[in-house]
Amino acid sequence: MSEPWRDSNNVVKAWKRCLGFFVQRRPPGFCERVPSGALTKPLAFNWSFGALLSAFAACQNIPSLRDEMAEDLPFLRKVHESYFDSRHQAFRSTPLRWKGDIYFDDNAWIALAALDIFRMSGQNLWIDDAMKIYRFILKEGYDPGSGGVYWRMHPKSSLHVCSAGPTALLGAKLMQLGESVPQDPIDKMIEWCWQMRDSRGVFRDHYNLITRRIDSSVYTYNTGTPLHAVMVMAEILPKEAYDNMAQDVLASAPALLPGHSLPATPWFNAVLLRALEKASRRYSQEMLSPLLDPYRRDMSQSWKRFESTDQPLVLPSSERKPGILLRDAASSVETLALLHQIAS
């Protein structure tokens, strides 16, 4: 099996091709899908743009690529600002020239990417954005009674692991950086997520406040962020409980990979891999290999296709519409960068 992730030059090559494939200079932004369909807005939803920011951060985290990656940051910043709604101090789902909604989960993903960019660039405007988003979610999206976080601003009809998990992780990372954030909401969000685990130990999707039922759908990213959050908390407050929670989730995580294969959801899988990269610095390879091997296998196959075409790197995706989604391509680049970090 080839191991393209071992060479950092492959990582930057994949990043540059992804960037060039989706970029739009006027107005500045990135396409949601290439080629665009008749009913597709030309510019990406912030979910997909957030995936691109996360891919940038993962690539920039590789020391040998830092200077070269920095060349792309000013343009990314310009696009980033086009989603910002100053009235709410949060990011809308589309650039402000179009009517868009505010989703709490998408804001948390953008804030997490912003924090990672801050760590590498030292530019305070990125951590300032992360703090604005965290305060906004605690004020408008966090339910202190349950510890859950709503999915979207309107209607507030469901509490989602995909909102509570990344928000808990965001709070933990801000605390780790020395920001003044209270611990209680972080712990409550983690506890709420833990109530959403099924009998196998993986995390179910959301609780519907209208029907009072739990949606039992399982996605890899919903296990990734609670796992990541407790590992960060274990570094801040070395309590045995946090470490035990992390190891318990890792022991349950193979249930996400039926037949030892990843689901065809590249972005969801990249979120889980962020947590596994963190775990690779804490726990044994013996524990993690069954989880990491499917990523390596899929990447090896996808890299062969990448090298034989002029298309972006794209891992197996269940997307059935024509063209390539930005978030699928961006998360494939992020996966390559994370595998490089794990191997280093």
Located regions from the model:
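Active-site cradle of extracellular carbohydrate-active enzymes
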Residues: A164-T167, G171, P182-V230
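CBM-like carbohydrate-recognition segments
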Residues: E3-D105, L159, A241-D248, S252-S344
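Oxyanion-binding "anion nests"
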Residues: V218-L256
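Extended ligand-binding groove/face enriched in aromatic
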Residues: A70-L177, D184-D187
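Inter-helical turn/loop segments and adjacent helix faces that build the functional surface
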Residues: I62-P63, M120-N124, L174-D184, M233-E240, ...
